[in-house]
A protein has these predicted regions:
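Macromolecular interaction modules
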Residues: 1-171
Length: 171
């Protein structure tokens, strides 16, 4: 399943410090049984929630378990909880997160916005199955920058660059 977290950093002057904290947060999440992979992204254009993290998880049960309650979720973000806004947490019923190379883009497509994409673009559609369910359906596509960057400004489409490589749990 894909656990997708979207947010805005409200204290942008502390971006480097936040990135360091978030990298440690990813490692902590990956230590929770059932978290398999994690990768962070940033929009290359203005967006309401410019930061996105895709986490691959085994099941929705993780979010009610003791390991997640002790190490994950908004209550375990310390001082950063109030410095992050426009926060959305959705769980999608897709088995694996895409592996987005550092030289590629992740394109997030809102339901009904795919008409702007070429028929040659493979969009992986996902249905929301848990947590906030702030959107019922959303698509993901991995594309080369030259192709994806031309979509900037298209309504319902966000173009994101990786902040770091995809991380995997040790188990």
């Amino acid at each position: 399943m894909i656990y997708m977290v979207e947010l805005a950093l409200l204290e942008t002057a502390r971006r480097a410090e936040w990135d360091t904290w978030y990298a440690a947060h990813q490692r902590r999440l990956l230590s929770i049984p059932g978290f398999r992979a994690s990768q962070r992204f940033e929009a290359i254009h203005t967006a309401e929630s410019p930061f996105v993290a895709l986490h691959e998880v085994d099941s929705p049960d993780i979010f009610t378990g003791p390991y997640y309650r002790a190490n994950g979720g908004p209550s375990n973000t310390g001082e950063w909880q109030v410095k992050m806004g426009r926060w959305h947490r959705n769980l999608f019923g897709v088995d694996h997160t895409p592996d987005v190379p550092m030289d590629a883009r992740l394109v997030v497509v809102e339901d009904g916005s795919s008409a702007a994409l070429s028929n040659h673009v493979a969009v992986r559609w996902m249905e929301a199955v848990g947590l906030d369910r702030s959107v019922p359906r959303r698509g993901l596509a991995v594309m080369p920058p030259g192709t994806a960057d031309r979509l900037v400004g298209t309504p319902g489409i966000r173009v994101l660059k990786p902040i770091g490589a995809r991380l995997r749990s040790a188990s």
